[in-house]
Amino acid sequence: MVMVKSVSKKYGEKKVIENVSVKIEKGKITSFIGPNGAGKSTLLSMISRLIENDEGDIYIDNQNIKKSKNNQLAKKISILKQSNNINLKLTIRELVSFGRFPYSQGRLTEEDWEYVDEAIRYMDLEDIQHKFLDELSGGQRQRAYIAMVIAQDTEYILLDEPLNNLDM
């Protein structure tokens, strides 16, 4: 379970999040709904430890994330931000393989490649997996990033506006 206890965050003098507490159960879908600027992205970034909270505590499976090692945390929780820009010449397959970094530190095993293949298949990217990211439509690129997060195989996946650029 992810537990957020009395968390606050401010930028300068502006409080973005004030005294927020929430429980996110493992295996459940939880959605944060609110207007632009309500702090949803900031909360997800604090839960994933991309940014530090000013007050309160965040726990994943009863472990305070401030005390978690990066490698261990990356095996428990993954995040897809609402805008992702990697300015490298990568194929979809190479991008998705980044999801396995917490397990292999860039030296992928046969098991890692199985996770990559499964994520590519799940997101219906098999036919274009060798295309470069800069050759893709916005929707194809978004599906590739989602596949990367799936390949990370964490217990919790945080998706910040995951339907951006996807045709529905």
Where are these regions (language model features)?
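Conserved structural motif at the start of ABC-family nucleotide-binding domains
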Residues: V2, I17-E18
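Conserved ABC transporter NBD signature motif
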Residues: G56-N64, L73
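Conserved ABC ATPase signature
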Residues: F132-L136, Q140
